[in-house]
């Protein structure tokens, strides 16, 4: 995005300052995402960014672009969610969450796409994510194992509310992916060592939380990222496998999955879906626990599952979307997912230069943890939504650079 300033006077200086301020504010927002008691700072950064974009747009100093391969599937999903508001069980909660957990992040997505419009800016954005995650990991690990005195065999938990234990693996895997990418791209040893050092707390968090979803997401993301560097991939996987063999995390894969309460919850959610198959119960996240008679749905299950605990949310991203937006809603959401990964796959294979292909590989891998961990846990909260929004935006920026390069080659 280029600022449309033709004269150098006081007003042009002000507009230039505003344009520079927007990515700074967004950078602060992204950095603060996982930290507690920073809601005010994040809200100020977000709404101030939106206001400044509006000022520049109304003054005709910028031309916003909304071109993206995600536009059509995304618009269809948003339109269906909006349509479902008219049939929501709890309209107030659904309207609130429709804005807070969907529209707001679409706005954030397009601002990031328009103001982080170069490979250099994407690199800086990845540094912000890595730095924020590393500080969070070191702080929480130190607090849990040193200050509180828990032994290392104790499952890492008691995380801040913005980052529950089961979801911290999302940012940990993304931090690892971006750190490895920056190691490959760094030209000096100092930078390589810095990015190498931040891998330790990220890996520690994944193993100490002992969550199957995070471990599976790590495996799949590493395979995706390093498929072209087989020796490095094999070395890392052997190291990860060795740690699993001697750590309590390995025992998580030997537990009897048939006793997992998530199976019962999936069956219970299916009973709800059968009553609301088209538009779902509404987009509101509190509707499932607050407005449905879950005990009556529990009575429809077999005796084995009736005895198990009733969870207050679907505990799975895909069943969560299905119960809130109906069967058409989950189909449209899967369409958004497919469009994102197809876009990244094409850039991996046919990027107009090595930087685009390299970053497309990283962003493809960075999208994996959200959708893998989503099989095991409810991931729709502001922290993972913000990260997913940024990852989608990074992918779109790469697509735009690729398209611009193709156009310039034809001239």
Predicted regions and their residues:
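Transmembrane alpha-helices of multi-pass inner-membrane enzymes
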Residues: 47-54, 231-232, 363-411
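Extracytoplasmic loop-helix module adjacent to an early transmembrane segment
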Residues: 48-52, 262-276
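Interfacial transmembrane-helix termini
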Residues: 30-49, 63-70, 79-105, 114-124, ...
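Long extracytoplasmic/lumenal interhelical loops at the membrane interface
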Residues: 254-267, 282-325, 347
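Hydrophobic transmembrane alpha-helices and their immediate junctions
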Residues: 325-368
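Transmembrane signal-anchor helices characteristic of membrane glycosylation enzymes that use polyprenol
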Residues: 32-35, 242-251
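Alpha-helical transmembrane segments of multi-pass inner-membrane proteins
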Residues: 29, 50, 78, 82, ...
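Transmembrane signal-anchor hairpin modules in multi-pass inner-membrane enzymes, especially those
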Residues: 1-93, 117-123, 127, 182-193, ...
């Amino acid at each position: 995005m280029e600022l449309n300033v033709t004269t150098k006077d006081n007003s042009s200086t002000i507009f230039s300052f505003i344009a520079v301020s927007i990515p700074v504010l967004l950078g602060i927002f992204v950095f603060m995402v996982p930290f507690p008691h920073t809601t005010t700072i994040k809200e100020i950064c977000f709404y101030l960014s939106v206001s400044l974009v509006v000022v520049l747009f109304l003054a005709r100093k910028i031309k916003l672009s909304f071109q993206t391969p995600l536009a059509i599937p995304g618009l269809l999903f948003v339109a269906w969610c909006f349509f479902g508001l008219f049939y929501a069980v709890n309209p107030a909660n659904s309207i609130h969450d429709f804005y807070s957990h969907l529209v707001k992040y679409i706005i954030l997505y397009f601002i990031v796409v328009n103001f982080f419009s170069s490979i250099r800016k994407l690199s800086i954005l990845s540094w912000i994510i890595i730095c924020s995650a590393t500080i969070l990991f070191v702080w929480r690990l130190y607090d849990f194992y040193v200050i509180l005195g828990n032994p290392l065999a104790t499952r890492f938990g008691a995380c801040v509310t913005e980052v529950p234990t089961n979801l911290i693996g999302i940012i940990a895997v993304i931090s690892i992916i971006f750190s490895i990418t920056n190691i490959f791209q760094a030209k000096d040893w100092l930078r390589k060592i810095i990015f190498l050092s931040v891998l330790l707390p990220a890996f520690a968090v994944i193993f100490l939380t002992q969550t199957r979803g995070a471990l599976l997401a790590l495996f799949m993301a590493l395979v995706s990222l390093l498929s072209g560097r087989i020796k490095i991939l094999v070395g890392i996987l052997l190291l990860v496998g060795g740690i699993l063999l001697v750590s309590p995390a390995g025992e998580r894969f030997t537990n009897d999955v048939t006793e997992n309460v998530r199976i019962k919850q999936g069956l219970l959610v299916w009973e709800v879906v059968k009553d609301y198959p088209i538009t779902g119960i509404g987009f509101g996240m509190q509707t499932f626990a607050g407005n449905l008679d879950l005990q009556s749905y529990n009575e429809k299950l077999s005796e084995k599952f009736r005895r198990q605990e009733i969870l207050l949310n679907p505990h799975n991203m895909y069943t969560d979307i299905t119960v809130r937006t109906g069967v058409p809603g989950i189909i449209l959401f899967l369409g958004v997912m497919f469009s994102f990964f197809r876009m990244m796959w094409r850039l991996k294979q046919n990027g107009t230069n090595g930087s685009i292909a390299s970053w497309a590989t990283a962003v493809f891998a960075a999208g994996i943890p959200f959708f893998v961990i989503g099989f095991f846990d409810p991931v729709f909260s502001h922290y993972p939504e913000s990260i997913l929004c940024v990852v989608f935006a990074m992918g779109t920026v790469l697509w735009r650079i690729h398209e611009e390069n193709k156009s310039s080659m034809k001239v």
